[in-house]
């Protein structure tokens, strides 16, 4: 019989000659540190061993990982919980473990470099002091709300007492990441220093002994009084509800739990925190948000093709417009890759350079970047009106007008001027990639790479191989997207690809509701209340009414009359309305020099143009149902036809590309939640009410008959 070897501990203690202990957190076999349930015993053990040292003066907690302190708790622990009580117990274990650090008899200081998030920041908050590195990789935050949860190991109680209730609520409710200098200003850390002296600074802080707690700013002290507290929580609750529309229960519970701790004491706060954590862990919203987290994490590790990607050294971009400028920006500033832009004139190149300058300047103004770093990143972007420098690029991303012959010409010119290995990636939103590659000498190196506007903010790209695109080209294009900070889904070369294909029927149904006399604001409000970030009419104005009408004929030609856009769009376009970009759309936009309106107002002349009298007659839930059911039906068709590789990819595409409500997990998770049989019955009812275009697709009918789901039960 062989004796089973104990797992190596993630917490290693070293006692220095000056009697200061250094606890190094290094989870074996993992790239980053995440906190796991089994670490409770390991933390207990390391603290007991430290206590046994008779002359111990203090402890410093550091990470053994190169650029990560603790990335958070391992959320697979939550999936293992089957009841709220089990999840509550998990939170209580975390609380009691960190309470041991907080109650330790000598000073404990956290030396933070890299990501310090979720349970990682809660651990740091339990320490008696915190210092962090000034490195760009250092970020502190409590992002649990983004998983439909709240910090469950004391974060809702310690943070308000450290930096004040208003700033703590802002951090916890948004899940935002705080950089080093901002953390210092907030009082979240006691010092921020270069990484090279981080450990020494933490040791010096321990040697200074117990420090008196930093006094909160007078504004925060004012808000601690009964009147200030009542006012603060009233304002926060109102603002939060305006953002969440009541769709995210975690936000309301965070406010309640923080208030409980401040009103009834920290012990009551911990009790409320653990109970709320347990209950939130069992909500469908948290399950959906966690599924998106796992899906996006998995996608970031996938290559997209059965081949190794080629090395990427330089990138070329054709076109310096809005899309070209945005692509250049993310390639240089996030990917760290030199970019060469070609445009027909200097104005286009300057436009692209200004795009990156404006994005980086915003970071400089908010003190998230130094001017020297902005200059360094701008140096990565250059431009030319000819193809000089293109013989060095590995991928060329084409972002010119939506014209097939022009794009084919671009392919020919790149094959002439670039290296034989250069990949041609087209940022088309509607043209078939196979047609763009039709005259190519190396069609296996032509692919679609569809970005969404604004490029620096939208996280999704669609990677679109055509019939003869090579696996190496797919893998290299996905690798480039990852470098740009994007989540990539590989979709088939079919009309509209995936995102635009499911978006078109959704927008068309909103237009039909408009033609029935439903006011513009009422339509948008219905879908925002449902959970979309903006309504369908606002979205059309933002994307461009002309862009929407260009995609529609392609969809009708290849997929049939159900994609025919209502005549309303043609009438609006003929009136010279393209949306926000030309200041004329479904909404009013202030002209230059005019003051911006606090709330957007619909342009009532649109009603005259369309010959309708606006009157709200449909219930908000009915409007949302009509629009969303069209999207769900089309998403199921896309899966059936192989446009997307999996329900997972379809959910990520809809949430990251359109803003499908994250708390529903995406179209496929939502259909599972409703039950496919109910989806089919709803579509059949709408079909009887409004027409054949609501007919449920074969995939949904088949699944309903057989009682099937898109995801396994409990996954």
From Swiss-Prot:
The biological processes this protein is annotated with in GO are: fatty acid beta-oxidation
User: Mind telling me which residues the site (Important for catalytic activity) is annotated on?
Assistant: 122, 144
Q: Where in the cell is it found?
A: Cytoplasm
Annotated pathway, please?
Lipid metabolism; fatty acid beta-oxidation
* Keyword RNA-binding among UniProt keywords: no
PROSITE patterns listed in its UniProt record: 3HCDH
Taken from the UniProt entry, a GO cellular component term is:
cytoplasm
Gene Ontology molecular-function annotations: 3-hydroxybutyryl-CoA epimerase activity; enoyl-CoA hydratase activity; long-chain-3-hydroxyacyl-CoA dehydrogenase activity; NAD+ binding
EC number(s) given by UniProt: 4.2.1.17, 5.1.2.3, 1.1.1.35
Sequence segments annotated as region (Enoyl-CoA hydratase): 1-194
Complexes and interactors: Heterotetramer of two alpha chains (FadJ) and two beta chains (FadI).
Name of the molecule in the record: Fatty acid oxidation complex subunit alpha
Organism field: Serratia proteamaculans (strain 568)
């Amino acid at each position: 019989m062989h004796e089973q070897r104990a797992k190596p501990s993630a917490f290693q203690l070293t006692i220095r000659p000056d009697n200061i202990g250094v606890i190094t957190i290094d989870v074996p076999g993992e790239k980053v540190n995440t906190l796991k349930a089994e670490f409770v015993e390991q933390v207990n053990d390391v603290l007991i061993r430290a206590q046994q040292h008779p002359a111990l003066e203090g402890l410093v907690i550091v990470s053994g990982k190169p650029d990560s302190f603790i990335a958070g708790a391992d959320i697979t622990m939550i999936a293992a919980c089957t009841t709220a009580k089990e999840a509550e117990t998990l939170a209580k274990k975390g609380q009691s473990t960190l309470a041991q650090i907080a109650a330790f008899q000598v000073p404990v200081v956290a030396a933070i470099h890299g990501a310090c998030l979720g349970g990682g920041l809660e651990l740091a908050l339990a320490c008696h002091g915190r210092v962090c590195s000034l490195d760009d990789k250092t970020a502190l935050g409590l992002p649990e709300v983004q998983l439909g949860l709240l910090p469950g190991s004391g974060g809702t109680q310690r943070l308000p007492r450290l930096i004040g209730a208003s700033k703590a609520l802002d951090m916890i409710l948004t899940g935002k990441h705080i950089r080093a200098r901002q953390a210092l200003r907030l009082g979240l850390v006691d010092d921020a220093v270069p990484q090279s002296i981080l450990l020494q600074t933490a040791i010096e802080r321990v040697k200074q002994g117990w420090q008196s707690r930093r006094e909160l700013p007078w504004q925060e002290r004012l808000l601690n009084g009964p009147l200030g507290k009542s006012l603060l929580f009233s304002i926060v609750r109102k603002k939060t509800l305006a953002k969440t529309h009541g769709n995210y229960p975690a936000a309301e519970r965070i406010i309640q739990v923080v208030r409980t701790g401040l009103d009834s004491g920290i012990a009551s706060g911990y009790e409320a925190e653990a109970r709320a954590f347990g209950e939130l862990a069992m909500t469908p919203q948290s399950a959906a948000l966690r599924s998106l987290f796992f899906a996006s994490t998995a996608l970031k590790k996938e290559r997209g093709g059965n081949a190794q990607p080629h090395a990427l050294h330089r990138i070329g971009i054709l076109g310096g417009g809005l899309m070209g400028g945005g692509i250049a920006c993310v390639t240089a500033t996030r990917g760290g890759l030199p970019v060469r832009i070609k445009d027909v004139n200097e104005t286009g190149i300057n436009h692209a350079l200004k795009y990156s300058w404006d994005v980086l300047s915003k970071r400089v103004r908010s003190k998230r970047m130094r001017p020297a770093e902005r200059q360094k990143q701008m140096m990565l972007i250059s431009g030319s009106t000819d193809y000089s420098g293109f013989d060095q690029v590995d991928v060329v991303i084409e972002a010119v007008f939506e014209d097939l012959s022009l794009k084919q010409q671009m392919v020919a010119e790149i094959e002439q001027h670039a290296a034989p290995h250069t990949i041609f990636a087209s940022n088309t939103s509607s043209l078939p990639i196979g047609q763009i590659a039709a005259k190519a000498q190396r069609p296996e190196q032509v692919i679609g790479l569809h970005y969404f506007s604004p490029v620096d903010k939208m996280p999704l790209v669609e990677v679109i191989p055509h019939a003869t695109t090579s696996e190496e080209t797919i893998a290299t294009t996905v690798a480039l997207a990852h470098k740009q900070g994007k989540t990539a889904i590989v979709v088939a070369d079919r009309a509209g690809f995936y995102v635009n294909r499911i978006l078109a029927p959704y927008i068309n149904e909103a237009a039909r509701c408009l033609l029935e006399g439903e006011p513009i604001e009422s339509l948008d409000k219905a879908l925002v209340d449902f959970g979309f970030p903006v309504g369908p009419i606002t979205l059309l104005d933002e994307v461009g009414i002309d862009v929407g009408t260009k995609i529609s004929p392609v969809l009708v030609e290849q997929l049939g009359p159900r994609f025919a856009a209502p005549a309303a769009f043609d009438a609006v376009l003929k009136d010279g309305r393209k949306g926000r970009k030309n200041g004329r759309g479904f909404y009013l936009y202030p002209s230059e020099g005019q003051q911006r309106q606090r709330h957007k107002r619909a342009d009532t002349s649109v009603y005259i143009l369309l010959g309708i009298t606006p009157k709200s007659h449909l219930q908000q839930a009915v409007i949302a149902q009509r629009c969303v059911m069209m999207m769900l039906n089309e998403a199921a068709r896309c899966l059936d036809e192989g446009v997307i590789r999996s329900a997972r990819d379809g959910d990520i595409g809809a949430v990251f590309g359109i803003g499908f409500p994250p708390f529903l997990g995406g179209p496929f998770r939502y259909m599972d939640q409703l039950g496919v049989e109910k989806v089919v019955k709803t579509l059949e009812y709408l079909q009887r009410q409004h027409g054949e275009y609501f007919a449920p697709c074969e995939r949904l009918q088949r699944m309903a008959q057989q009682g099937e789901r898109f995801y396994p039960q409990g996954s």
